[in-house]
C-alpha cells in the first residue's frame, strides 16, 4: 500500500470514528430528554418506570385537590375514568388548573405510586385538550367534561 493511499485510509477511518462518537453523544443527549406519556391506567398497572421523568395526564378528579395551608404543596388525583393516580406538586399551579379539567404533569413516579411533579400544564381553553389526554379518554370510553375535544 503506498503512503498516500494509507494516509487517505487513516483519514477516512478517523472521520468515521469521529462521526460515530458524535452520533453516540447526540443520541445519548436526546434519550435523556425524552418524556414518555403515560395514562393513569398505565401507571397503576406498573407500565411506567420508577424514578424516570414521565408525563402523566388525564382529568383532575372533583374533590381531590388538597392544598397545604403553610406551603405551596398541592396534592390531587388524575383519572382516565378507569384508574386514578395521585400527583403531588410544589409550586404555583397554572391559572387554568381546576377540578374536572384536563392536565399533563411532568415528573417522576415514586415507589408509592405517586407522581412527584415538577411541572403542571393545564389546557388552554374550554375546547382544547392535550392530544395525549384526548386519546387516553377516548380509549377508556369516556368523553371529557364539556363536550367534544379538539386536539
UniProtKB/Swiss-Prot annotation:
Subcellular locations according to the entry: Cell inner membrane
Positions annotated to bind heme: 124, 128
- Kindly give the NCBIfam families that the UniProt entry links to this protein: PRK13254.1-1 (NF009727), PRK13254.1-3 (NF009729), PRK13254.1-5 (NF009731)
Topology term for the membrane: Single-pass type II membrane protein
BP term (GO), one: cytochrome complex assembly
Q: Which GO terms describe its cellular component?
A: plasma membrane
- Side Cytoplasmic, residues: 1-8
Key word NADP present in the record? no
GO terms assigned for molecular function: heme binding; metal ion binding
Residue ranges annotated as transmembrane are 9-29
What's its job?
A: Heme chaperone required for the biogenesis of c-type cytochromes. Transiently binds heme delivered by CcmC and transfers the heme to apo-cytochromes in a process facilitated by CcmF and CcmH.
InterPro entries assigned: CcmE, CcmE-like_sf, NA-bd_OB-fold
The molecule here is called: Cytochrome c-type biogenesis protein CcmE
Per UniProt, the keywords (alphabetical) are: Cell inner membrane, Cell membrane, Cytochrome c-type biogenesis, Heme, Iron, Membrane, Metal-binding, Signal-anchor, Transmembrane, Transmembrane helix
Which residue stretches are annotated as topological domain Periplasmic? Answer: 30-151
Question: What is stated as this protein's family in its record?
Answer: Belongs to the CcmE/CycJ family.
